[in-house]
Amino acid sequence: MPELPEVEVTRLGIAPHLRGRRLEGAVVRDSRLRLPVNDDLAARVSGQRLLNLRRRGKYLLLDLERGTILIHLGMSGHLRVLPQSAPVQKHDHVDLLFADDLCLRFHDPRRFGAVLWLDDADHHPLLQHLGPEPLGDVFGAEYLYQRGRNRQIPVKSFLMDAHIVVGVGNIYANESLFAAGIDPRRPAGRIALPRYMKLVQAVRTVLEAAIAQGGTTLRDFTRPDGGNGYFRLSLAVYGREGEPCTHCGAPLQGVRIGGRATIYCSQCQR
């Protein structure tokens, strides 16, 4: 599933081509996504100028003059900026049509994504209860320490809770906990403030590196230019169960936490 870095890479890739342009409408070939596409999407966006493209967690938000288009890439979605006349491929479900023969095309084979019209994005149920951004100022060691006090939930599940912090999915939770030397099974309430300081720095370092390298392509994700993300070449633990730890050489261990594959080093992570 595309996580924060992949959504940010997408935003950075499409923003220069579309910001400030006027929409001419939309083509919805299949509205049956995880959340159905609005029946009146074309009418709502037609004639409006795209003022800004921003990201909130794993959501991409296209702010128009009146209202916002929310896009979630789901498990397998990606976006491309193309000529409106570009051949339509299987699973090209939605086109947002812009002036000068451009379109933003949403491709989603597994249809777990979303393209929604929001009248008031900041107060929409999908967004209003989200935690802070991991690359923002609110996200810090003291914040995590206070939110984790007396909680027995494994720190990996705690870190992946979008009400605590947004956008840290399975890949980057694994990598951040390894970088911080914290056992993913450890209860969130049993981590001291200095260790949370290491974790916050690790999360930021890992996410920033992933964005710089174009995200992580494991199967479905491609950048808006059609290329792959190369952070997968830097993965220290994710997908490496049984292989030697890059720090100590011990075999990496695998366990499921919250139903998600979790890889860690029993020697380096405590």
From Swiss-Prot:
The subunit structure is: Monomer.
Q: Which PROSITE patterns does the entry link to?
A: FPG_CAT, ZF_FPG_1, ZF_FPG_2
Role description: Involved in base excision repair of DNA damaged by oxidation or by mutagenic agents. Acts as a DNA glycosylase that recognizes and removes damaged bases. Has a preference for oxidized purines, such as 7,8-dihydro-8-oxoguanine (8-oxoG). Has AP (apurinic/apyrimidinic) lyase activity and introduces nicks in the DNA strand. Cleaves the DNA backbone by beta-delta elimination to generate a single-strand break at the site of the removed base with both 3'- and 5'-phosphates.
Organism this protein belongs to:
Acidithiobacillus ferrooxidans (strain ATCC 23270 / DSM 14882 / CIP 104768 / NCIMB 8455)
Q: Does the keyword Zinc apply?
A: yes
Annotated catalytic residues: P2, E3, K58, R260
Database matches in InterPro entries: DNA_glyclase/AP_lyase_DNA-bd, DNA_glyclase_Znf_dom_DNA_BS, Formamido-pyr_DNA_Glyclase, FPG_cat, MutM-like_N-ter, Ribosomal_uS13-like_H2TH, Znf_DNA_glyclase/AP_lyase, Znf_FPG/IleRS
Cofactor needs: Zn(2+)
The cofactor note reads:
Binds 1 zinc ion per subunit.
> Which lineage do the record's taxonomy fields give for this organism?
Bacteria, Pseudomonadati, Pseudomonadota, Acidithiobacillia, Acidithiobacillales
The protein's name in its UniProt record? Formamidopyrimidine-DNA glycosylase
Please name the HAMAP family in this protein's record.
Fapy_DNA_glycosyl
User: Which keywords accompany this UniProt record?
Assistant: DNA damage, DNA repair, DNA-binding, Glycosidase, Hydrolase, Lyase, Metal-binding, Multifunctional enzyme, Zinc, Zinc-finger
Query: Pfam families this protein is in?
Result: Fapy_DNA_glyco, H2TH, zf-FPG_IleRS
- UniProt similarity note: Belongs to the FPG family.
Q: What is its EC number?
A: 3.2.2.23, 4.2.99.18
Which positions does UniProt annotate for DNA binding?
A: H91, R110, R151
Under catalytic activity, the entry for this protein gives: Hydrolysis of DNA containing ring-opened 7-methylguanine residues, releasing 2,6-diamino-4-hydroxy-5-(N-methyl)formamidopyrimidine; 2'-deoxyribonucleotide-(2'-deoxyribose 5'-phosphate)-2'-deoxyribonucleotide-DNA = a 3'-end 2'-deoxyribonucleotide-(2,3-dehydro-2,3-deoxyribose 5'-phosphate)-DNA + a 5'-end 5'-phospho-2'-deoxyribonucleoside-DNA + H(+)
Q: Where are the zinc fingers (FPG-type)?
A: 236-270
Any one GO molecular function term: zinc ion binding
